[in-house]
Amino acid sequence: MKQLLCYLPWLLLLTLLVSPLNDARFVVEKNSLSVTSPESIKGTHDSAIGNFGIPQYGGSMAGTVVYPKENQKSCKEFSDFSISFKSQPGALPTFLLVDRGDCFFALKVWNAQKAGASAVLVADNVDEPLITMDTPEEDVSSAKYIENITIPSALVTKGFGEKLKKAISGGDMVNLNLDWREAVPHPDDRVEYELWTNSNDECGVKCDMLMEFVKDFKGAAQILEKGGFTQFRPHYITWYCPHAFTLSRQCKSQCINKGRYCAPDPEQDFSSGYDGKDVVVENLRQLCVYKVANETGKPWVWWDYVTDFQIRCPMKEKKYNKECADSVIKSLGIDSKKLDKCMGDPDADLDNPVLKEEQDAQVGKGSRGDVTILPTLVVNNRQYRGKLEKSAVLKALCSGFEETTEPAICLSTDVESNECLDNNGGCWQDKSANITACKDTFRGRVCECPTVDGVQFKGDGYSHCEPSGPGRCTINNGGCWHEERDGHAFSACVDKDSVKCECPPGFKGDGTKKCEDINECKEKKACQCPECSCKNTWGSYECSCSGDLLYIRDHDTCISKTGAQVRSAWAAVWLIMLSLGLAAAGAYLVYKYRLRQYMDSEIRAIMAQYMPLDSQPEIPNHVNDERA
């Protein structure tokens, strides 16, 4: 209950916002229906064109009316009743008459189409003026079949429906013509049309359908506009906040210019996500894109901006903002200063001329009713009814040309428009390598990073694309730095699976935009041995040695110019000779020492027989003593 009370002020505000629409003048778009037989009901009647399927604008269709005995409201599949309305070869198409009630109008037509009907007439069950059969509001399940409805449908009054049923039940063959040739005025050789749209991309099924239509129809719209065959103008529905609520939190979050211009909250949650005022500001920006582009004689640029903004700046990716919009504007070459001037200040307590004009245009004038349905397409001041789909809308536009003045596109199903020839379609391009991300398709140009010579470019396709994977260095050096001087070329591209730019040895920098030569001599990175003399070169260095020496780069040292192997051999020879010499000297010393020691002992032995030696103790001579 507390949560409900919090929302009561906003619910009251919504009531006040929509209350002016109660007096709105809604015009039901009609087509002519002529009964050719039987005579009892022969004549011309009005029918209301259904706002789905594909009405045959500019043409007519003849058929036989059938009223089923079962499933008369067409709320179930006719296959459940083993009923088929497929026409036999040579027979007129089948127009199925069904009753209103119990299910959506679109479901009735879908079930009839699956059973083989060529058109559907829905008989009203209320005695009232004709109304427009619209699609279900925000119904996901119905969206699956609505987009596949291709047959026309129309609502007839209760009284006329009863006449048709009575004639059929009486056994009469009821033949009639559905005529859309006058559904759209066709006074001259130029068609004027307008699309009431919205920049909100989170409002459900209808927003998805609208975005898809804009992307699909862009190519045809630009061909017609560039050829001067049409005059297109976009519009955006806005509301105002009653003066009593302008200071409320709800109005502040949903409105700009102090409550003058408002839009509903995209997520219907005032505490999170984007606010209604964000939508109003973007709507205003898109209106100003059209105005600025129209002043330069290129109003068709609006289609480029809207489709690019949808792709690049979606709400679900949190990119629905001015920064993303500015990047799209820049890529399309739109004057941002003129755009800002057109938008004005959304916080000012003043009327915004652009949005004020939009509010005034919502009110119907002449044969055109008030705009109350979003989206709404108006062709030659008549509201379009039917499926918002390229071929269907193109048929409606072509029916607005005076006879014999239709452009070639109306007489052919082929549409060719090479948008990449104008400003490269606003896509990324590398002029030096003649590579572009712009691809021209039937539905208009697409900005998609290309594959060149087997190398895949990656990026958003609008402002950035770079080669990736093996072989990427063969394409403009992989987007990395490269330079050539005096016959020497260096590149920072590393040919690996990952995208990488790395300055080569001898350079330093980011590898992408700049690599600077490293002064190995000044920074003492090489050639630092005592005998070395250093000289810096571009991307490298030169090192020389004093005297008869040779510089070894890997070891940063100087050696004799004689070959290393010869030097090693001589060193081995000298080592052997030195070893032999030392061995000989040692042997000689040992020999000399031993010989001397032997000779000393022999001499001492001889001398000891004749005289006492200093080292020999004196021995008494007992023989002489006895003789004495």
Curated annotation (Swiss-Prot):
Residue spans, topological domain Cytoplasmic: 591-628
CDD domains attached to this UniProt entry: EGF_CA, PA_VSR
SUPFAM superfamilies: PA domain (SSF52025)
Glycosylated residues (UniProt): N148, N294, N434
An annotated GO BP: protein targeting to vacuole
GO CC entries: clathrin-coated vesicle membrane; endosome; Golgi apparatus; Golgi cis cisterna; Golgi membrane; mitochondrion; trans-Golgi network
Transmembrane spans: 570-590
Signal peptide: 1-24
Domain PA: 56-168
Lumenal topological segments: 25-569
UniProtKB keywords: Calcium, Cytoplasmic vesicle, Disulfide bond, EGF-like domain, Glycoprotein, Golgi apparatus, Membrane, Protein transport, Repeat, Signal, Transmembrane, Transmembrane helix, Transport
Membrane topology designation: Single-pass type I membrane protein
Record domain EGF-like: where: 416-466, 469-516, 517-559
Annotated S-S bridges: C420-C438, C427-C447, C449-C465, C473-C493, C480-C501, C503-C515, C545-C558
One example GO MF annotation: calcium ion binding
Distribution of this protein across tissues and organs: Expressed in seeds, seedlings, roots, leaves, flowers and siliques.
Location(s), subcellular: Membrane; Golgi apparatus membrane; Cytoplasmic vesicle, Clathrin-coated vesicle membrane; Prevacuolar compartment membrane
UniProt entry tagged with the keyword Cell membrane: no
Family according to the record: Belongs to the VSR (BP-80) family.
Domain remark text: The tyrosine-based internalization signal may be involved in trafficking at the TGN.
Function: Vacuolar-sorting receptor (VSR) involved in clathrin-coated vesicles sorting from Golgi apparatus to vacuoles.
Descriptive protein name: Vacuolar-sorting receptor 3
